[in-house]
Amino acid sequence: MAGIRIRDIAIYHPSNKIGNDFYIKHFDDRGIEIRGLLAALGRETRYSIDNEDENALTMGFEAASNVLEQAGLAGEDIDLIAFSSQTPEYIIPTNSVIMHRLINGAARTICIDSNANCIGMTAAFEQVSRQMMANPRIRRALVIGSDHILPHTDRNNPVYYAGFGDAAAAVILERDENAVGLIDAIYQTDTCVLYNSVFPAEGLAKLGTKGVAPGEFNVEFTPFDDSICVEAAVESIKTLFADSGIAPESIKAACFSQLSLPNILSVAEKVGIDSSVAVYVGDEFGYTSTSSPFIALHKAVSTGQIERGDKVLFWTVGGGMQNIAVVIEY
């Protein structure tokens, strides 16, 4: 049986790079101390859109263009486009259909948008891989993850405003008779923090009738102890390893949610993975939400941490709370 492998991966981020000092001053002026938070999260810099021309869609297009060029492919070579975002620039038409136009896709191309919040791109990767296994018409797929959170962040909320960054990732998946690719995946859903992040705060129906004041179309966030994510991750990953017969020491790169460095290290330790295997990019990129595990994968590939045939573990968690763990052979 053919495997579905990652043929290529590329990323895009805006040129505007912001260090911690900007946010420290911003919150100092409001009487809010964030130095401890930034240190705990492992933040140093992040990239942020600072113009009206860029958004989640344009970042996704840049990442897609980069990966197509890198692979020596054109839009017409792609059989499926999946665009993952929780801040889609458009709801109608879908961003994947717009992407189809931008890359000059073929008439046969399947176009789907995916929103599973911060697990979106990882879930899309898993779901598209399985769809490719079942549908011989799909030889190559383009999976894109891109979020632009800044326009929807409360400037008095340090977790979102100082913790997040803008970036997009794109991967080309390809059917390969000699590859393993996706090995297995597991999901876990626990709605104990169902409404801790809500956007739009009152739902789309009320937004359409009541409107919202400029600068107030923001995520409504209620802080919670995110260490609960660690236990969910550990349970999922241990189950995945047991079901797939995978030894922790065989994992060459752990590409986890980049929200919190302590959580990354804690999960790695609890599942028996050496901390050197855990990839961290949140110090440079901040938390890029849906794309963050694949920004980490890009670093692992570009630095030579992993080679073809190595096993890679993904884990991330999304609003609600839902988490996903995926293991692949790169």
Residue spans of the language-model regions?
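Condensing-enzyme catalytic core mediating Claisen C-C bond formation in acyl metabolism
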Residues: M1-D53, N157-S227, E235, Y330
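Flexible, glycine-rich active-site loops centered on histidine and acidic residues
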Residues: M133-A167
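A glycine- and small-aliphatic-rich helix-loop capping segment at beta-alpha/alpha-beta transitions
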Residues: Y23-H26, T94-A106, S129-A134, N157-G163, ...
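Conserved beta-ketoacyl condensing-enzyme motif
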Residues: I6, E52-A116, S236, L240-I264, ...
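Acidic-glycine-rich active-site phosphate/pyrophosphate-binding loop
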Residues: R30-A39, Y90-N104, V143-I149, L204, ...
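Acidic, glycine-rich active-site loops and adjacent beta-strand->loop/helix elements
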Residues: Y12, S84-E89, A116-I119, G145-L150, ...
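Claisen-condensing/thiolase-fold acyl-transfer catalytic domains that form or cleave C-C bonds
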Residues: L57, F61, T87-P88, A106, ...
